[in-house]
Amino acid sequence: GAITVAAPAVAGTNTLTLPASTGTVLTDTAPKAGNVLQVVHYLWQSNVSTTSTSYVDSGITATITPSSTSSKILVIGSANAVFTAAVNTGVRIGLFNGATELTTPAFYAGYDTASTDNQRNVPFSNLHSPSSTSAQTYIIKFYRNTGSGSVAIGANDSNSFITLMEIAG
């Protein structure tokens, strides 16, 4: 069988035919383990610079509310790290869920030359099991872990992003 939805009277044929089936992704109330249930994406196009040797907030953040306590959150993204003209300057980038650092070890990038505004995209990922249906906020923080120059996340019209995917457990 099928369900037919007829469009209003206009020029041409405008009929949409849908199969009469159950259990599709659109109507299933018990998704299979591994199904993607929702996606949150945040594109960050700004700049935060520091010489700090302890974590500072980059501005790259996104929040997702899991629909089940058995869900996992797949976090992927990339932070564009920019280094000033200082030899051996490095950056440590950490992924946090609230105040808890999820990435151990953290992600690192660095330069050993004194060029101006060296840049490096630093990809990151984590599969987190929050075991909660409360809103989960993921934040990228960073600091200068080596050298004497400043480090920045974003600059020179570069983009950074974070994407959160709820995966059914």
Task: For each feature predicted by the language model, list its residue ranges.
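Surface-exposed, glycine- and small/polar-enriched segments that build interaction surfaces at terminal
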Residues: 9-11
